[in-house]
């Protein structure tokens, strides 16, 4: 799609007034340049909007590029926005077996080398699980990292034991029950204010969760993020938290041990 038409497609609310969640996602999807790079025995799917310095967005676990749907149009006004579906999630194929952090990062490294010109500086942005993937990918391009931004990074805490009561959407007997399970889980995991859990948020969760085909907690070490950050000393970094995030207090309690000491 020509850049001017893409910009027109990205204008307006997310969603626009009267636009259904499905139509909103379709608008962003059809306006994107779809790119494919190798991943295991299949492909890794990337979406690109805008032009300028590259900004790479890394989504959270059980997610896809749509985790960034409210950010894309703003950032694409000044930058080239790249959103990849991480291996085993969203539209991307499974990574090679046995699964490991390294095989996930390998796929990102191959993709970046294919899609972005050599030596061009890159901004890396990660949400939750995506923060660990962003940081470890950035480590392979250390001389090209313009900045690293991490949002809600539970791996920057010393504990994973935050009590949450989740509902199984898989065992829901009706579409309505399944929808409410996704709404409940968003409230437990991601969104503190009930009024912010709109139909778009629940729709995205309902489409992303069933496409998660790997359990990353089983093979990605908890210290993978902090170890990458140690290797990235000197890189401009930004760490963003919601003050009601269950892990935020744990982050503050862990900061002296995990961040300041390193």
Predicted regions, residues:
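Conserved alpha/beta-hydrolase "nucleophile elbow" surrounding the catalytic nucleophile
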Residues: 59-61, 126-131
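Active-site loop/oxyanion-hole signature of alpha/beta-hydrolase fold enzymes
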Residues: 39, 82-126
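Conserved catalytic-core motifs of eukaryotic protein kinase domains, centered on the activation segment
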Residues: 67-69, 92-98, 160-162, 250-251
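Conserved loop-alpha-helix segment in the C-terminal half of the alpha/beta-hydrolase fold
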Residues: 238-262
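Flexible "cap/lid" loop of the alpha/beta hydrolase fold
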Residues: 132-139, 146-176
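Conserved alpha/beta-hydrolase catalytic His-Asp/Glu region
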Residues: 159, 176-234
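Conserved HGGG/HGGXW glycine-rich cap/lid loop of the alpha/beta-hydrolase fold
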Residues: 45-91
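Alpha/beta-hydrolase fold catalytic core
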Residues: 1-55, 77-79, 119, 262
């Amino acid at each position: 799609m020509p850049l001017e038409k893409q910009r027109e497609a990205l204008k307006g609310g997310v969603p626009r007034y009267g636009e259904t969640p499905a139509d909103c996602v379709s608008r962003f999807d059809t306006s994107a340049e779809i790119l494919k790079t190798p991943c295991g025995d299949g492909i890794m799917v990337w979406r690109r909007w805008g032009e300028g310095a590259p900004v790479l967005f890394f989504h959270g676990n059980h997610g896809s590029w749509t985790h960034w749907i409210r950010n894309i149009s703003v950032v694409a006004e000044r930058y080239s926005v790249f959103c990849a579906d991480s291996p085993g999630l969203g539209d991307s194929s499974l990574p090679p077996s046995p699964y490991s952090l390294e095989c996930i990062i390998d796929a990102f490294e191959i993709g970046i080398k294919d899609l972005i010109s050599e030596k061009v500086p890159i901004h890396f942005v990660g949400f939750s699980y995506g923060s660990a993937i962003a940081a470890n990918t950035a480590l392979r391009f250390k001389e090209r990292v313009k900045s690293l931004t991490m949002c809600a990074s539970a791996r920057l805490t010393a504990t994973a034991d935050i009590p949450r009561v989740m509902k199984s959407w898989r065992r829901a007997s009706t579409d309505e029950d399944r929808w409410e399970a996704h709404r409940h889980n968003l409230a437990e995991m991601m969104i503190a204010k009930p009024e912010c859990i709109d139909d778009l948020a629940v729709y995205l969760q309902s489409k992303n969760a069933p496409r998660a085909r790997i359990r990353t907690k089983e093979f990605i070490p908890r210290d993978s993020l902090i170890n990458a950050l140690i290797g990235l000393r000197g890189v401009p970094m930004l760490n963003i938290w919601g003050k009601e995030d269950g892990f935020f207090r744990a982050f503050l309690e862990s900061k002296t041990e995990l961040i300041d000491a390193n």
